[in-house]
C-alpha cells in the first residue's frame, strides 16, 4: 500500500509507505524484513491452457510510478520514468518510434488514434501526435499520478490536489476544471478517468465517483463507492482505485476500504454494491466483473446483480494487478512479474508465465487473445492465451 500525504493546497507527496507486507520500516535496526502477511507460495499445478510469448521489449524502469500500456488501433503506447515514450506494433512489438520527453515522467500513457498524453514531473502535461511529435504542453496544479484520459477530442487529467482539468486535444486550451477538497492522506495509486460519449467518470479520494459532463465539466451525478470511517486518517482512507470500468449501460468501480459495485452510467443509480477493499482497478466482460482485493483474493461477480461467481485465494498477499479477461481466462499479474491465468468459469488456475521478476504495474490491456502489460523493471510483454 502506498500512501501520499498532502500539505495545504500544493499537493506535494510527502511520504510513501511501501512496507505494507513487512515490519522492517518500523524497525530500522532489523537485519531483514519480518513478514507480517507473507505472500503465498506458488502452487504446483498441471497447466490446462497454453500461453505463449508473443513479444517482449524494454522501455525503461518505472521507478515509483504506475505506468500502464495504452492501446489504440493496432498500436500500443508505453512510457518510463526517465522520459522514454514509445509506439509499438501491438501484434509484433516492433518499434514504430521512440522519443525522450526530456523530463522525468510520473504518469501515462493515455492515447487515442491521434493523440498521446503523459504526465511529467512538476505537474506538466505533455501531449504528442500519433507520429511522436510534441503538440503542446500545459501546467497542471500539482503532480499527476494517473494516466491522462484521451477521448472525444479532450485530454483530461487529475492532479494529486484533486483538481480535474480538461484540455483541448489539438490546441491544449483549457476547456474546464473541477476541484474538490483533498484529504490529508490518500493512496499513492494511479487514479483513472474513463470517458464515454457524454461523460468523464472520475474516481476520487474519499470514495466518491463523479460523472462530469464533457461539455462543461459540470457534475451529472455523484455516488459513494467508499465511506471514510475510523478514528485515524489512515483508517479513513477510502479512495476509488484504478480506472472506472464501462460495462454496457453501467460503470463499475472499486474503492480501498470501501465497496465494489456498478451504477447506471446515465443516472448514477446503484445497480449493486458489495463490501470490498482494493488498491487496483477492475476488469469486466459481458457477464462478470473481476477484482483483486487487498489480501490478494481474486473475485468474480455477475455484472448485472453482483452475485458472487467464484473466488480464488491462491495468490494471497502477492500484490496483484487489476485482473483482466483474455480468451477463456482472467489474467492477473503479481509482485514477482508472474502473469497468472484463471478460468473465467470457476477461477481455477489454468496457466502461469514468468517475466523479469519485478512487479506487474498498472492495468494490463487486452487485444484479441493477447494481454499486454508492463513491469516495474521496464519489461513490456505480450502473452497470447491459446
Task: Report residues per predicted region.
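Short loop/turn segments that connect beta-strands within beta-propeller blades
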Residues: 89-92, 129-133, 168-172, 214-216, ...
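Structural signature of WD-repeat beta-propellers
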Residues: 80-81, 120, 159-160, 204-205, ...
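Conserved beta-propeller blade signature
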Residues: 75-78, 116-118, 155-157, 200-201, ...
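Loop/turn-rich, solvent-exposed surfaces of beta-rich toroidal or solenoidal domains
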Residues: 288-300, 307-341
Amino acid at each position: 500500500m502506498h500512501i501520499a500525504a498532502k500539505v495545504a493546497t500544493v499537493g506535494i507527496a510527502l511520504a510513501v509507505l511501501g512496507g505494507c507486507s513487512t515490519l522492517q520500516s518500523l524497525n530500522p535496526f532489523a537485519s531483514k524484513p519480518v513478514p507480517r502477511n507473507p505472500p503465498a507460495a506458488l502452487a504446483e499445478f498441471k497447466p490446462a491452457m497454453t500461453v505463449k510469448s508473443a513479444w517482449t521489449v524494454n522501455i525503461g524502469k518505472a521507478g515509483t510510478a504506475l505506468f500502464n500500456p495504452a492501446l489504440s488501433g493496432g498500436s500500443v503506447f508505453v512510457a518510463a520514468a526517465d522520459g522514454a515514450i514509445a509506439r509499438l506494433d501491438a501484434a509484433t512489438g516492433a518499434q514504430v518510434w521512440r522519443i525522450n520527453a526530456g523530463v522525468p515522467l510520473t504518469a501515462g500513457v493515455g492515447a487515442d488514434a491521434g493523440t498521446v498524453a503523459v504526465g511529467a514531473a512538476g505537474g506538466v502535461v505533455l501531449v504528442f501526435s500519433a507520429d511522436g511529435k510534441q503538440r503542446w504542453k500545459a501546467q497542471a496544479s500539482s503532480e499527476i499520478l494517473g494516466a491522462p484520459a484521451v477521448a472525444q477530442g479532450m485530454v483530461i487529467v487529475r492532479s494529486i490536489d484533486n483538481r480535474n482539468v480538461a484540455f483541448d486535444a489539438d490546441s491544449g486550451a483549457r476547456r474546464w476544471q473541477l476541484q474538490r477538497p483533498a484529504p490529508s492522506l490518500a493512496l499513492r495509486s494511479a487514479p483513472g478517468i474513463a470517458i464515454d460519449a457524454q461523460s468523464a467518470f472520475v474516481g476520487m479520494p474519499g470514495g466518491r465517483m463523479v460523472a462530469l459532463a464533457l461539455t462543461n465539466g459540470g457534475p451529472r451525478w455523484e455516488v459513494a463507492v467508499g465511506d471514510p470511517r475510523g478514528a485515524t486518517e489512515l483508517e479513513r482512507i477510502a479512495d476509488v482505485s484504478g480506472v472506472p470500468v464501462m460495462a454496457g449501460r453501467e460503470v463499475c468501480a472499486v474503492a480501498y476500504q470501501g465497496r465494489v459495485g456498478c451504477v447506471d452510467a446515465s443516472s448514477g443509480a446503484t445497480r449493486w454494491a458489495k463490501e470490498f477493499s482494493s488498491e487496483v482497478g477492475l476488469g469486466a466482460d459481458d457477464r462478470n466483473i473481476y477484482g483483486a482485493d487487498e489480501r490478494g483474493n481474486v473475485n468474480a461477480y455477475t455484472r448485472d446483480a453482483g452475485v458472487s461467481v467464484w473466488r480464488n485465494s491462491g495468490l494471497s498477499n502477492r500484490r496483484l494487478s487489476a485482473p483482466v479477461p483474455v480468451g477463456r481466462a482472467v489474467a492477473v499479474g503479481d509482485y514477482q512479474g508472474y502473469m497468472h491465468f484463471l478460468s473465467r468459469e470457476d477461477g481455477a488456475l489454468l496457466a502461469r508465465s514468468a517475466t523479469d521478476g519485478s512487479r506487474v504495474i498498472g492495468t494490463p490491456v487486452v487485444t484479441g487473445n493477447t494481454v499486454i502489460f508492463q513491469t516495474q523493471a521496464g519489461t513490456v510483454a505480450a502473452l497470447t492465451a491459446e
